[in-house]
Amino acid sequence: MLVVLLIAVLLAASPARADETCMSPYMPKITGQEDYVYVWTLGVDGVGDGSDKLVTVGANPKAPGYGKVVSTVSIGGRHEAHHGDFSDDRRFFWAGGLDDSVLYIFDMAGDPAHPKLVRTIDSFVRDSGGVVGPHTFFALPGRVLISALSNDRDQGGRTALVTYNNDGKFVETVWMPEKAEYGYDVRVEPRLNRMLTSSFTGHQNYMRDLPGLMGDAEAMKHFGSTMVVWDFHARKPVQTLEVPGAPLEIRWALQPRHNYAFTTTALTSKIWLIAQQDDGTFRATPVADIADPKRTPLPVDISLSADDRFLFVDTFMDGMCRVYDVSNPHRPKLTHEQKIGAQVNMVSQSWTGEHVYFTSSLLSKWDKTGKDDEQFLKAYRWDGKRLSPLFHVDFRAENLGRPHIMRFGQDRFYKNQIFEGS
């Protein structure tokens, strides 16, 4: 246990890393320049093969494939591809479909430029006892923890946390606690033996078209308004925090003496600080408005720099990225804002903070229409003051689909690994 804690602290403190800052602390980091950005992509009818796919884009400016599509792996059909992440050894990439709850496992180690689909798990709902909508995939030692959004009884927001081992065998289901039954993201801080979960909405809402949903007063009542603090090792809830407005992505601070996390609320457009108090409990406090909440800019993804100084906040409806100085986490200061596109969703930055990547798609039925339905991966350089464009991949022109979550890969990392059974 002490060794794991020391590793987590050292990884958090190192300024030389080039991996994403939101990765599981149980996962090895890649160092130096990332070679690839892996993009889990929703299929679009009439665009290419129309299927969900894992897209590999070159990210090393010294390589011939820089800023270009290197490879694609289609899975057949459209399943609402959304989130995914690596196993604790980064050998495999686990991904899921929010609609039919199928899991996909890709081998990344054999050829990092050309991932290979090696396993499909179509028993997630049955294995888990009725959980629907696998969302966040979080690496644990020898296991993958999956947060979810819904259930198969009423397709509402009651849901659970589900664990598989790295071989794809079901381990356990832990249902969300009473009066905090909704789920979304999950993040662990090993130093504190604390896990945080957030809350969104169920299948009956997220698979509905956005204008119709927002015009349905009853449906809009069925969004989460809580975060849960867990005893991580015991998998037991210890606190329920009131965070009105659908708290989404969670980002723990990365420096070893910073015992707090950030989230944003989609419906109320606020940055929230989830901070540990002197007595060990946590308190949730709104610390900043994001743009004009009355206009519902819809905050989606966030990314915290490795030094805990900058928080990048994407807002879907206006296509903006806003960068806040959160050196004082209680008083975020807006330092930069930039239009990324007609719509923007995910943001990923390298550990050094020099490279920041954006994708455009939120959900297949929530994305904009017509000329505003831009679908892209865009790369920028961040110099601490402003974002400068590096490259742009048009996922429609490339016949790929709707790009969502991103993860980084590197040839050198895999050449230096020895995997059991390989």
Which residue stretches match the model-derived regions?
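Short loop/turn segments immediately following beta-strands, especially the blade-tip
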Residues: V57-G65, I105-P115, L273-A284, V323-R331, ...
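Beta-strand-rich domains and repeat architectures in extracellular enzymes and scaffolds
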Residues: D19-A59, G65-L98
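Asp-box/WD-like beta-propeller blade repeats and closely related beta-sheet repeat scaffolds
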Residues: A109-P190
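Loop/turn-rich, solvent-exposed surfaces of beta-rich toroidal or solenoidal domains
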Residues: S269-I271, K294-L377
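Beta-propeller domains
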Residues: S87, K179-G183, R187-C321
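Blade-loop segments of beta-propeller domains
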Residues: Y66-T136
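Short, conserved, GDST-rich strand-edge loop motifs in beta-rich repeat architectures
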Residues: G32-D49, S147-G157, S198-H222, T359-L377
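Beta-rich, blade/repeat-based domains predominating
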Residues: E20-P28, D49, G76-D88, R126-R143, ...
